[in-house]
């Protein structure tokens, strides 16, 4: 007589489950059917997953006929047992089948059970229907059938498919539903081991970040749907180097405050109101989602962007920095930048003038508004920069340094060559702040001594203002076009600006929010992505050169002259005996706008023509000063560009003139006749005459 499991013996069901499966597999199908009638409704735990059970029933299809969503689709009823029969016909699914199958019972996936009501009017099921399993995305009903030789089959009712599970019950006791094709068919869990999916309790700390990272690949919409289900959950973020250093991420919606198991969430609605303008500029409006904060530092929030990178924001001082390329990389490797910085004070030390209420803030703000060269500290790599914040007047500032409305290329030019400009001030008679600070110096003189000038000087300044706007607008347009083409001028120079300027360049490099090219190291975010600023309006440029009113020139400021070329050394002259001529003086900005760059690809500075902006009306035969070329990748060479409507800057030299020497990466060790001319360009014969 078969063993009957009564209600009082519920703790013994799991050990006896193997007996029931072996009992079903080692008897004829006629005896198995008698056992099903005797133990109708008994739940036998599956070998895997243990959370699911087989509901023994002699006629499981009779229970499914009451759902209109199945009966209205005749193709789903193929092979079903008739009212007077018990057997399932597999020929509509496998034409080579020679025997019928006996239904053993029904498996209802735990999250669904029987949620589809009898009044359902759906004609078909889709992966987004709420009746489908939230674990697998497949049908919530699976019917287990047994063949003549003991093989087990699985019938996916709502999909109308038949799969083989195993060729014997003994093999099924080892694998369970691991090889059930109806479950493996779901695309969301194709690359995830299935045992971790069957969790009826709260997701564990290791499984939840994996689930979130997989959904983040499909964008913010897929991540948001799963993130809303697990608000208040905690997951551990381990340190990639120090195993004992770890912190917890608390999934929280900052807009809902402390409701729904979010008691540890800080009230940060007013803080995010300050961060919103900065995040909208960096990621775009609607392209970022704050999803968690750190349990050890509740003021640090993690933000997922539309492109995939993960940002961290400190809501106290409104500083933003990038911590990982995507959420899965953050889960696997942790974040050295995030976790190692938790021991340090994230807020600046007292006395640094960071807080808006501290003394010296207004004076610092006025100083940053008056000086147009103050962005040097924001892009310089000589020391750590200060965190970014949004000032009370709505401007984005890096520490106490306010970003001016000039294009990014001019700001980074000042940052690259702050030392060079200060050393050349004695040649130009400047005030010691560089030639680009003449505008600020001029404005200061306008405020202090307007009576010393005359009406003629004011009219002169008004006329030159229009030319300045036209020049700056053209420079800004050209710099944006060069930046969007993927130039690596600023990324190779070591002055790349971090998001919010947090940390040094070697510890937190600037990587764009969305990497468009195959090599992200050669791409620099355009200025409108970092901190966009309105450009001055376009005005027509006259043919006459623009006159920039300046302070009275000093005695050392003289117009540039064409210096004669030093004689070429002979072959027997040693390299050390040849004195290299110094670089000619830089012309004042009133003659032509000059762009300075420091080349890092060669040991000796190489000279090549660079475009002027705007094109000056100087004739082609007049001498031009050599320019240091912009920084480019090692495999690229800059070509001299010519403005449309103007002749070439360097006309072709006659055949008698020597050819230009190519630019090399290092000075040759042996003394050669052209060793002293490495990197020099031979001027045309018309110039030397």
From Swiss-Prot:
Region listing for Disordered, in residue ranges: 347-689
Record-given protein name: Uncharacterized protein DR1
Organism: Human herpesvirus 6A (strain Uganda-1102)
Compositional bias segments (type: Basic and acidic residues): 405-480
Biased composition (Low complexity): 347-359, 370-388, 570-581, 591-610, 666-676
Misc: DR1 gene is not required for propagation in cell culture. Loss of a part of the DR region may occur in viruses propagated on cell cultures.
Composition skew (Pro residues), residue ranges: 515-539, 550-569, 611-620
